[in-house]
């Protein structure tokens, strides 16, 4: 008889395998949400939102959680940024960053896709990790700002 913990462990192992497949095949979906000035009736920028492309994950946060567990969150984030920059070349862009990506140092590498964007870019730190985590990321955030990008905390009202 399979115990509940064993089922959870098997499911986690399946999700980790699925993340490896997604990242290796560069199969990350993306949609763009317009950020508009309703008074001027014009689009100011677009927010690039990663989308789950695997049936095993019920949501995008679940996909990123599995990527953290699999040690692939930096690669998944980089794929997201690459697609966003390639597909939204003519507008200012808001990019969500999972705070766990700071552990890998990829965000400040000169070859990161976000540095190819020729319009204003705002890095949004996602609400998935409590705010206390941000003190550990101060030097990375400072370096991103020095490179001319704006910073924002995404969904600040989420309770973190």
List PLM regions with ranges.
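Active-site core of bacterial EAL-family cyclic-dinucleotide phosphodiesterase domains
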Residues: 4-66, 153
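Conserved protein-kinase N-lobe ATP-binding Lys motif
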Residues: 54, 67-71, 99
């Amino acid at each position: 008889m399979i115990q509940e913990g064993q089922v959870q462990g098997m499911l986690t192992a399946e999700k980790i395998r699925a993340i490896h497949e997604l990242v290796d095949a560069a199969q990350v979906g993306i949609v763009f949400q317009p950020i508009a000035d309703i008074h001027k009736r014009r689009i100011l920028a677009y927010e690039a939102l990663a989308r789950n492309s695997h049936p095993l994950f019920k949501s995008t946060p679940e996909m990123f959680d599995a990527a953290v567990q699999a040690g692939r969150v930096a690669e998944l984030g980089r794929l997201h940024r690459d697609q966003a920059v390639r597909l939204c070349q003519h507008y200012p862009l808001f990019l969500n960053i999972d705070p766990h990506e700071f552990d890998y140092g990829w965000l400040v590498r000169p070859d990161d896709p976000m540095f190819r964007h020729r319009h204003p870019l705002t890095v949004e730190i996602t609400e998935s990790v409590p705010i206390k985590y941000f003190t550990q990321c101060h030097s990375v955030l400072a370096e991103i700002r020095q490179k001319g990008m704006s910073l924002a905390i995404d969904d600040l009202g989420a309770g973190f």
